[in-house]
Amino acid sequence: MKSKISLVFKKCNEVEKRPALLTYTVAGDSSKKKSLEIINSISDHADIIELGFPHNTPIADGGQIQVSSHRALQNGITLPSIFEIIKSFKKKNKSKPLILMGYFNIIFQYGEINFLKNCKKVGVDGLIVVDLPWPENKKFAKNCKKYFIDFIQLLSPTTPIKRMKKIIKDSHDMVYYISMLSTTGGKLKVSPKKILKNYNIIKKINPLKKVVIGFGITTKTISSLRKADGLVVGSQLCKEITRSITKRQNSVTNLNKMVYKLKNKII
């Protein structure tokens, strides 16, 4: 049986001839209730929802996501409360894929198998573990499969071809390509042409594997990368939550409008 993630790519890439739009927000920002309202709202336009679990030392996250994480942690967000957010979201959006993204030490402290059991129970479709690279992640990725969860491998511009081939061979339904050597939310320092050139190299290794591009993608840059299988926007959304809070505006409405704009740029 095909996963929800692969079905979304089939619909977006093959039927609608466009990339899938993946949105990233931090679970619990700016509160548990608001976080759920945001993902419920943006799922009107996003094809796949990415939800990050906040961490006090997020090595790959840029300033905007760190601010979001800090707000969520200040509001007392925990892994069990993140599972509650996902459970509530899935009741309303059963067919919408949700990818949980975070750091391995939180999973390790919670207990790997216990974590995966809870992910399956609430309806998590995929996992990205930033600080668990290949081949160290092989055992964990295998366990994910047992619980019908996609483990999403990461590739970067410095990944050698030989290593890339091995990672892609071991990957599940999709691969996440980090477009540039930076934390998330940095300005796009590499031209879209260069990013797509690297993307095409990855696609040639196995054209059947779906490749999404993340880091530095905004309303300004998204349309230039529409040849990709999928595009991830995160920092711009976290920045909008901060702006909405500062201006005392409705972050749910503002994010819905932003994701609608992003979607229209790739249709």
Model-derived segments and spans:
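Conserved beta-strand positions in the central sheet of alpha/beta enzyme cores
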Residues: 50, 128, 153, 175-176, ...
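Histidine/lysine/aspartate-rich catalytic loop segments that bind and position anionic ligands
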Residues: 148-186
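Alpha/beta catalytic cores of nucleotide-metabolism and tRNA/nucleoside-modifying enzymes
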Residues: 201-209, 220-223, 228, 232-267
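Catalytic cores of alpha/beta
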Residues: 31-43, 159-170, 205-206, 213-231
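Active-site-adjacent beta->alpha loops and helix N-cap segments on the catalytic face
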Residues: 1-12, 55-67, 74-87, 108-113, ...
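Glycine-rich beta-to-alpha transition loops that act as phosphate-gripper elements at the mouths
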Residues: 26-31, 101-109, 133-134, 155-159, ...
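Short beta-strand/loop segments at the ligand-binding rim of alpha/beta enzyme cores
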Residues: 14-25, 93-103, 144-154, 202-216
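Conserved, mostly hydrophobic/aromatic
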Residues: 23, 42, 49-52, 119, ...
